[in-house]
Swiss-Prot record:
This is UDP-glycosyltransferase 1. Induction: Up-regulated by methyl jasmonate. Signal peptide: none annotated. An anthocyanidin binds at H15, A388.
Length: 471
């Protein structure tokens, strides 16, 4: 029987794509393995096109068909859809769906074990509750952590903080000292772990504990990018036990989308090399009209060329139809900046834009996939974190890696036009900006080396597969 590995994706298209890319990477170096990807779909009453967990059947079926045709050694297995009567927020739905389908997971894994040598299962870290099933079945259990090693170190440290304190993190008002990392203020910890009374707090303690107690964690980073913290892990300097780590990144989409329906790539073709700053904040990065206007004024003040993806919050009084750009932005802004800037609604081919020679800077929400895309293309960043672990990523990018600048927010979370304009100008047109550009160019070279034959990430992948075959 063939040796097989199961990858279990969390709910949502982005999570599925991450697992597919991991599967493709494994097979490109170890084609004798068979890979099965398990995926979840939302309950019928909670699959809306605008939901962050949206998983429309047609789009998913087309994506899976394309992957299967290109990579026959990857097979897909959908966890049967179940009903959850209570409408839950996206993150809570993700956790609950995995927990509530444990009996289906047990049946599927038992079936796979009867037709192949099931060597290991890799869980998306959001599917942490599946470890209870896999441990009962005595299947070696690994986690795929799609962020970096630095935030993983902070996640493990959260267990120690929980054990040693009765206060919530938000009340500590202190800097955390974690081996291999710069000082991290408690204000920069993820919102979900700030407050012990937050319903997500215990979940993240459980996630950290399950990952720490697993057979290993696969991390989407590379040694040269997070060298100090990886050295701390490898030398056993972390407080408390840690599992084996395998840094196999950067794993990002292997084929940048070249769709140019809005003409942005053609527009970039007409701009000077490294002259355009790109602003995009992820699928959940929506701003109030007040903030959008501050961004617009700041870009105009900066006098830099720009390509900006605008996503607006739904505000009371808005009609079903989204407001036009003219309604959202300052009067005359589009006309005044049409020679220097381009504004898009809701979406842009980010990977293709970042790889374009005209792009010289990236204002980002610091989502890890976006960070990796920027690093792989050597594009320096302005860090504007919005949610999840993004404040931690900002600290690492700015204080540790020194490949970006951070914007300052006021007490209401607003970034002023002056602040944004100054940071954009500093990144694009200053000596400090040049230093940052040189640093991230070196990091780009290191990323290429890590994924080349004999590189650190490929060697880590080979070690991982050796361990799997020994199970």
């Amino acid at each position: 029987m063939k040796d097989s590995i199961v990858l279990y994706s969390a709910l949502g298209r982005g999570h599925l794509v991450s697992m597919v890319e991991l599967g493709k990477l494994i097979l490109s170096h170890h084609p004798s393995l068979s890979i099965t990807i398990l995926f979840l779909t939302p309950p019928p009453n909670q699959d809306t096109p605008t939901s962050p967990t949206a998983f429309t059947c047609d789009a998913t079926a087309k994506y899976i068909a394309a992957v299967t045709a290109a990579t026959p050694s990857i097979t897909f297995h959908r966890i049967p859809q179940i009903s959850i009567p209570t409408v839950l927020p996206p993150m809570a739905l993700t956790f609950e769906l995995c927990r509530a389908t444990g009996h289906h997971l047990r049946r599927i894994l038992t079936s796979i074990s009867q037709t192949s040598n099931l060597k290991a299962i890799v869980l998306d870290f959001m599917n942490y509750s599946a470890a209870r099933v896999t441990n009962t079945l005595q299947i070696p259990t690994y986690f795929y952590y799609t962020s970096g090693a630095s935030t993983l170190a902070v996640l493990f440290q959260q267990i120690i903080i929980h054990q040693n304190n009765t206060k919530s993190i938000k009340d500590l008002n202190m800097h955390l000292l974690i081996p291999g990392l710069p000082k991290i203020h408690t204000d920069d910890m993820p919102e979900q772990v700030q407050d012990r009374e937050n319903e997500g707090y215990e979940v993240f303690i459980d996630i950290a504990t399950c990952m720490r107690d697993s057979d290993g964690v696969i991390v989407n980073t590379f040694e040269a990018m997070e060298g100090r913290v990886m050295e701390a892990f490898n030398e056993g300097l972390m407080e408390g036990p840690t599992p084996p780590l395998f840094c196999i990144g950067p794993v990002i989409s292997s084929a940048p989308c070249r769709v140019d329906d809005d003409g942005c790539l053609s527009w970039l073709d007409s701009q000077p090399s490294h002259s355009v700053v790109f602003l995009s904040f992820g699928s959940m990065g929506r701003f109030s009209r007040t903030q959008l206007r501050e961004i617009a004024i700041g870009l105009e003040k900066s006098e830099q060329r720009f390509l900006w993806v605008v996503r607006s919050e739904f505000e009371e009084g808005d009609s079903v139809e989204p407001p036009s750009l003219d309604e959202l932005l300052p009067e005359g802004f589009l006309e005044r900046t049409k020679g220097k800037g381009m504004v898009l609604r809701d979406w842009a081919p980010q990977a293709a834009i970042l790889s374009h020679d005209s792009v010289g800077g990236f204002v980002t929400h610091c989502g890890w996939n976006s960070v990796l895309e920027a690093v792989c293309e050597g594009v320096p960043m302005v860090a504007w974190p919005l949610y999840a672990e993004q404040k931690l990523n900002k600290v690492i990018l700015v204080e540790e890696m020194k490949v970006g600048l951070a914007v300052k927010q006021n007490k209401d979370g607003l970034v002023s036009s002056t602040e944004l304009g100054d940071r954009v100008r500093e990144l694009m047109d200053s000596d400090r900006g040049k230093e940052i550009r040189q640093k991230i160019f070196k990091m780009k070279m290191s990323a290429n080396e890590a994924m080349a034959k004999g590189g650190s990430s490929i060697m880590a992948l080979n070690r991982l597969v050796e361990v799997w075959r020994e199970h």
